[in-house]
Amino acid sequence: MIYIWICFYLQTTLLPCSLSTRTKFAICHNTSKLHRAAYKTSRWNIPGDVGSTPPPSKLHQALCLNEHSLSCMAELPMDYEGKIKETRHLLHLKGENDPIESLIFVDATLRLGVNHHFQKEIEEILRKSYATMKSPIICEYHTLHEVSLFFRLMRQHGRYVSADVFNNFKGESGRFKEELKRDTRGLVELYEAAQLSFEGERILDEAENFSRQILHGNLAGMEDNLRRSVGNKLRYPFHTSIARFTGRNYDDDLGGMYEWGKTLRELALMDLQVERSVYQEELLQVSKWWNELGLYKKLNLARNRPFEFYTWSMVILADYINLSEQRVELTKSVAFIYLIDDIFDVYGTLDELIIFTEAVNKWDYSATDTLPENMKMCCMTLLDTINGTSQKIYEKHGYNPIDSLKTTWKSLCSAFLVEAKWSASGSLPSANEYLENEKVSSGVYVVLVHLFCLMGLGGTSRGSIELNDTQELMSSIAIIFRLWNDLGSAKNEHQNGKDGSYLNCYKKEHINLTAAQAHEHALELVAIEWKRLNKESFNLNHDSVSSFKQAALNLARMVPLMYSYDHNQRGPVLEEYVKFMLSD
């Protein structure tokens, strides 16, 4: 069964935790070979035994043996369409008769990942609710739970609601009312709503701090089920987490509270069955492409982990099961980020890395002639693959994005080269210099620009959003990723203080700062970038970009899954999620 090799692969191959292995660059003075990999914690992999990947041939055999069983699983669950119709009918009834419960119903579809079936019904419910509740005066007559839920759903769907609606829950002292401390349900939803804040919305900062402190303080006195539910929401707020991951816990929260809960749970399970079969088929396609490419044979030390490459695409596009072609094609770009990262970390001398970068900048096969054969093969195959991706986009969407795609690879290799020069020079850059370069070397721009084009955006069609309109959104995601990468790798006990992470660059500039203070500063920067990301996401309120925006947010949302380390520096939470998405 495919479940067997997935479990084996998860146990022996460490899952990715960033879009670049550069958790840090080691400071060294050896310019003949830049063996930085020996000093660093992999950003793509949660630290552990990097030499334990199963032999490619065995993995490929395991995949091929299951093609027949996978094709059998691809059949739709019994009465799948009937369950969708039943749920749609229930949602319509609630939308007509119970405004508040209809919002709870909508939230449940989002949390369980089945909202894609009911976009029309959800939009109508939100439209009606917004028309009647957007005024702070009207909100005065609703509970904390109701106002918080309304606020969050509206902001998530591009409808502006002023944070002033929460002033109704403050007393004469200007602080949140004491009686709210007993409203656990309301406080949880207030905490969730505060995750949608923009910069400068002080009341939402107060709301987050107030709700978090009270809920944390009350956890010990809660019943087991409630304590587990509240703890999960504090750790993984819905807006900043992957819906399918948090939805597993929400399934328990529904309980028997609503008559539609059972139907919705059943549909979510059917959906998951369909998604698993699709993901497994896609993984076979990725494995076939990877093995036919054969680059891991040329690059003996390159990571032979198609499962990891695919994990990124699967999670980023988890909300859109119909985008199968995009997931497979995006995985190819992820694979080359891995490969080129290994080129810069393990293979090249500084002179060779300069030639490699120039060849990519020229996008010219002949510019690779003086490179070693393995580096030459990697560069030429990159050009072939990205040219092929561009051609597929042209055939499907009618425009050729090759210039945009080439630009991302040029920028990535140039950023990698900057790191190599830093490493060779033996000095750390300033914190700002580091962050500006590292947000590019993260690979986030490569992935998101390729995804943008694969989704048919930025073409010549009237009203299409332009790639430049997404730059601030991409920048915030890249910074969030970079900082979390460095925060996660800072747990590595082998760090010596000379590695190139943001924390060490920042501490170099603030010599009296403790490690804990530097850590807190980085967390504050992450929080600021989430506020900026919220605003940019809200401003990109264009129908054509909604799927891309959700996928981009999912890239940022992967972070809490990646950095839930155990004592072995593994990521059991991410492993658990991937198992859940791919196998029973």
Swiss-Prot record:
Binding-site list for Mg(2+) 2: D341, D345
Keyword line: Chloroplast, Glycoprotein, Lyase, Magnesium, Manganese, Metal-binding, Plastid, Transit peptide
Required co-factor? Mg(2+); Mn(2+)
* Co-factor binding details: Binds 3 Mg(2+) or Mn(2+) ions per subunit.
Indicate whether Manganese appears among the record's keywords.
yes
Q: Which residues bind Mg(2+) 1?
A: D341, D345
Induction summary: Circadian-regulation with highest levels in early afternoon and lowest level during the night.
Q: In which tissues is it expressed?
A: Accumulates at low levels in flowers; mostly expressed in both upper and lower petal lobes, and, to a lower extent, in tube and stamens.
What is stated as this protein's family in its record?
Belongs to the terpene synthase family. Tpsg subfamily.
* Protein's UniProt name: Tricyclene synthase 1e20, chloroplastic
**Source species:** Antirrhinum majus
- Classification of source organism: Eukaryota, Viridiplantae, Streptophyta, Embryophyta, Tracheophyta
Q: State which gene encodes it.
A: 1e20
